[in-house]
């Protein structure tokens, strides 16, 4: 559960911004963000990932025409190997769910359109358009040229 910032009160994956100013790569930002967001408030180390642990499964453009500063391109990764466990942090309260019990009603409305596809092994590119009230106006999802992943 997102505890602060954009999307507060919604179940969401770990993530954040790429430090373009210092030449950070997307995969390095993903590794850094999950480390930061799974470290407990008292400094207990959470999840540790290596670049080979991540499989890129989606690139999604989120557009907010009336609030362009909210628009963002999101790179989605799945990990099947990691060290440590996620801890509650100032930003996130993690929770594991069976795929059949994912609480889409408590997530961003777009998640129910793309997340089942990537969890089934498909890799996608997508565009979601929202209004200033965060209501979905339209979307497009395409299978990508990324190679298909093999779920364990």
Question: Which positions does each model-derived feature cover?
Answer:
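Short acidic/polar capping segments at secondary-structure boundaries
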Residues: 4, 102, 131-135
């Amino acid at each position: 559960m997102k505890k602060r910032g954009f999307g507060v009160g919604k179940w969401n994956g770990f993530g954040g911004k790429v430090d373009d100013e210092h030449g950070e790569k997307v995969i390095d930002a993903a590794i850094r963000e999950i480390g930061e967001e799974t470290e407990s408030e008292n400094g207990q180390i959470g999840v540790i990932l290596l670049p080979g642990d991540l499989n890129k499964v989606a690139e999604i453009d989120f557009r907010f025409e009336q609030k362009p500063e909210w628009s963002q391109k999101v790179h989605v990764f799945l990990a099947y190997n990691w060290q440590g466990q996620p801890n509650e942090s100032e930003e996130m309260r993690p929770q594991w769910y069976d795929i059949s019990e994912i609480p889409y009603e408590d997530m961003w409305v777009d998640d129910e359109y793309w997340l089942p596809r990537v969890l089934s092994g498909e890799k996608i590119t997508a565009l979601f358009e929202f209004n200033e009230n965060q209501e979905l106006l339209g979307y497009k999802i395409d299978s990508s040229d990324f190679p298909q992943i093999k779920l364990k």
